C-alpha cells in the first residue's frame, strides 16, 4: 500500500480544482455534476445516498469506477458501505484481483467534490496487462465494457 499525505493538493488535484473553477465561471454549473449527468444519461451512473457513482466512458485503465461525494468520508458510514460493496463486486463478480484506489477527501474550500477512483490493474499473471508506457505517455488501452462493469456495480449497490 502507498499512502501520500500533504498540506497542499498534489498537482493533478490542484489542476482539476482550477479547471472546475473556470468551468463554473464559464458555464454556471459544476463540472463534476455535469460529467456525472452525462454518465447517468448513458446508463453508466447512479446516485446512491450522498454519493454519485459511475463507470467512466474515458477510463484511464480497465474498469475505472469514480465516486464523487461531499461528506466527511471518515464519518459517512453509507459511503464506506457503498465503497465496500463496489470493491467486493469488482473482486467477486468482475474478476479484479489487483487494483489501485485513490481518494481525494472532500474539502469545502475547493471546487471539486471528494473523489474516489478505482482502476483494475489487469491480470496479475501477465506482465503486459499492468500499467505501462502506452497508458502513461500515449493513449489508454481499454478492453472492458463499462456497461457490463457498471451493471454489476449497480446490482451490488442495490443489494
Stretches found by the model and what they are:
Residues 1-159:
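HIT superfamily nucleotide-processing domains
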Amino acid at each position: 500500500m502507498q499512502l501520500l499525505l500533504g498540506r497542499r493538493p498534489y498537482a493533478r488535484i490542484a489542476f482539476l480544482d482550477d479547471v472546475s473553477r473556470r468551468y463554473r465561471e464559464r458555464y454556471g454549473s459544476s463540472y463534476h455534476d455535469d460529467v456525472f449527468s452525462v454518465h447517468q444519461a448513458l446508463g453508466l451512473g447512479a446516485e446512491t445516498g450522498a454519493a454519485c457513482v459511475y463507470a467512466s466512458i474515458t477510463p484511464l485503465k480497465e474498469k475505472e469506477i469514480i465516486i464523487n461525494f461531499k461528506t466527511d468520508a471518515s464519518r459517512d458510514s453509507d459511503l464506506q458501505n457503498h465503497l465496500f460493496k463496489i470493491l467486493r463486486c469488482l473482486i467477486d463478480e468482475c474478476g479484479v484481483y489487483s487494483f489501485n484506489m485513490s481518494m481525494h477527501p472532500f474539502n469545502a474550500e475547493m471546487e471539486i467534490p471528494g473523489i474516489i477512483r478505482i482502476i483494475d490493474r489487469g491480470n496479475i499473471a501477465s506482465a503486459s496487462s499492468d500499467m505501462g508506457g502506452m497508458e502513461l505517455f500515449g493513449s489508454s488501452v481499454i478492453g472492458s465494457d463499462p456497461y457490463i462493469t457498471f451493471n454489476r456495480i449497480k446490482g451490488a449497490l442495490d443489494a
